[in-house]
């Protein structure tokens, strides 16, 4: 069997070679930079790639390792960040021309922690404008091209470039943010792993906000083990983010390989399955069979059935209202300069009253508590990450009304975890009859990232879906 090319390897295997001295961080960075620059004219995954800076960082990582200063398993590993996350000396545009000159002077906390762990930045990935859209479309900076189809298909959003950059082998990890599915949707549609962290586990300081109630930061990777390594490095309290002050933090690597024998895993019923693509239904149900074979007790659970309408309405109001207020403070009344697919959603909150917002927040808090009670005796929930696979951009973006319909469909399943305060992981679990990726969503209790990562790793070890890669001969 031929050796796996560097660009398809996981952080774990790359790290082993770097620490053995058989792979130079500089050689790895050069390989990935060359690949990104060769493909990105077609795929549009990146907002910017500062090549000289990336190579200098890789050289520094190599020199410190030679000097015996080993920062750990992430030392010398390239990564990308969604362009709403601050990187010192680079612009954070949030996918909008209105912020094209917004060069920042400090790193976001998550970036600083990954740099301290030895990682090296390759570039900033494209995003939906202001991180507000599930299909991944951006009319101002360009829509990243899902690498699994030669005809333009949606990558999922809003961490669109993050999903494409990992799926196309440009970087082994990219940071995204998740307010209603923005890590998990592109991960599922592009065939990667994506972790939605519990609010308070990972600092959001230095991240352009969408919703201070619902925003979270998480990695997109090639394997669950990689996601665990990155999460372990970036989680923890931060004085600059009050949401982290009262959180408890697990060692997610302890027990990571314990498997699922004896665990109760419940297939979430009700809304998660309505009008879902038949290929997705079949693939996700087969996941239950795999986990049963591994020793888990797999059953079904009526989840959210009576509260789905309340959760959806409250989620929509919280997200739109908090975004609207924040944008008024930052950019003023310039909504006519926004992409209509974004401004029309924000402006829905213009006529909302303080009482409407407070009711939505109260519903959010009540649903979070109810979810924790419901899941008291359940280790994790299983569901399709999305109800539909990636579709042609021309179909999703044919009109503003049609776009909003597809936007709601893409986020229908994922937004549940955000509204209920859960953590969630998506892992590749199949391909449709058209060869497009399918994601299994594993949801866990608040701050129980260790469990969803453990279940995801066990599933991944028993299957080979995370090893599947797109044929990119049409893009090279």
Question: What are the residue ranges of the model-derived segments?
Answer:
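An N-terminal boundary/leader segment
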Residues: 1-55, 293, 468-476
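Glycine-rich, small-residue loops and helix-cap segments
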Residues: 21, 32, 76, 116, ...
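Acyltransferase
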Residues: 22-30, 59, 278-302, 328-333, ...
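Acidic/His- and Gly-rich active-site-bordering loop/insert found
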Residues: 54-56, 64-141
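Short helix-loop capping/hinge segments that flank enzyme active sites or metal/cofactor-binding pockets
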Residues: 74-94, 259-268, 317-372, 384-388, ...
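General beta-strand structural signal in soluble alpha/beta enzymes
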Residues: 81, 121-124, 175-177, 300, ...
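Short glycine/serine-rich loop segments
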Residues: 106-237, 418-439
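A short helix-breaking turn/cap at a secondary-structure junction
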Residues: 196-282, 287, 308, 457, ...
């Amino acid at each position: 069997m031929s050796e796996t090319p560097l660009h398809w390897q996981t952080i774990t295997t790359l790290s082993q070679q770097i620490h053995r001295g058989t792979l130079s961080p500089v050689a790895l960075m050069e390989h990935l930079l060359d690949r990104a620059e060769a493909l990105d004219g077609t795929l549009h995954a990146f907002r910017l790639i500062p090549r000289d800076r990336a190579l200098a960082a890789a050289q520094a990582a190599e020199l410190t390792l030679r000097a015996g200063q080993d920062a750990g398993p992430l030392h010398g590993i390239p990564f990308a960040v969604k362009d709403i996350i601050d990187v010192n000396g680079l612009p954070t545009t949030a996918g909008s021309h209105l912020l094209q000159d917004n060069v920042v002077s400090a790193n976001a906390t998550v970036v600083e922690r990954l740099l301290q762990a030895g990682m090296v930045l390759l570039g900033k990935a494209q995003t939906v404008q202001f991180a507000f859209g599930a299909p991944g479309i951006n009319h101002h900076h360009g829509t990243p091209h899902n690498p699994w189809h030669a005809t333009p298909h949606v990558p999922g959003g809003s961490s669109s470039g993050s999903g494409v950059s990992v799926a196309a082998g440009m970087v082994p990890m990219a940071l995204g943010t998740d307010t209603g599915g923005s890590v998990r949707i592109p991960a599922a549609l592009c065939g990667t792993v994506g972790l939605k962290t519990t609010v308070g586990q990972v600092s959001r300081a230095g991240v352009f906000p969408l919703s201070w109630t619902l925003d979270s930061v998480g990695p997109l990777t090639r394997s669950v083990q990689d996601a665990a390594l990155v999460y372990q490095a970036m989680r923890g309290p931060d004085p600059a983010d009050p949401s982290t002050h009262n959180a408890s933090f697990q060692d997610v690597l302890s027990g990571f390989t314990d498997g699922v024998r004896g665990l109760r895993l419940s297939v979430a019923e009700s809304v998660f399955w309505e009008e879902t693509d038949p290929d997705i239904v079949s693939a996700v149900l087969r996941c239950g069979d795999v986990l049963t074979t591994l020793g888990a007790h797999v059953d079904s659970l009526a989840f959210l059935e009576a509260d789905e309408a309340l959760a959806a309405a409250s989620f929509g109001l919280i997200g739109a209202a908090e975004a609207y207020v924040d944008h008024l403070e930052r950019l003023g009344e310039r909504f006519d300069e926004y992409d209509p697919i974004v401004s029309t959603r924000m402006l829905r909150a213009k006529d909302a009253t303080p009482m409407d917002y407070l009711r939505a927040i109260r519903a959010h808090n009540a649903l979070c508590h109810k979810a924790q009670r419901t899941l008291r005796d359940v280790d994790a929930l299983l569901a399709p990450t999305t109800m539909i696979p990636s579709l042609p951009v021309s179909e999703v973006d044919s009109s503003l009304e049609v776009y909003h319909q597809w936007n709601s469909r893409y986020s229908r399943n994922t937004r549940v975890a955000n509204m209920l305060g859960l953590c969630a992981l998506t892992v590749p679990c199949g391909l449709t009859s058209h060869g497009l990726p399918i994601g299994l969503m594993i949801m866990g209790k608040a701050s129980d990232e260790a469990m969803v990562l453990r279940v995801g790793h066990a599933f991944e070890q028993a299957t080979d879906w995370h090893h599947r890669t797109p044929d990119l001969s049409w893009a090279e």
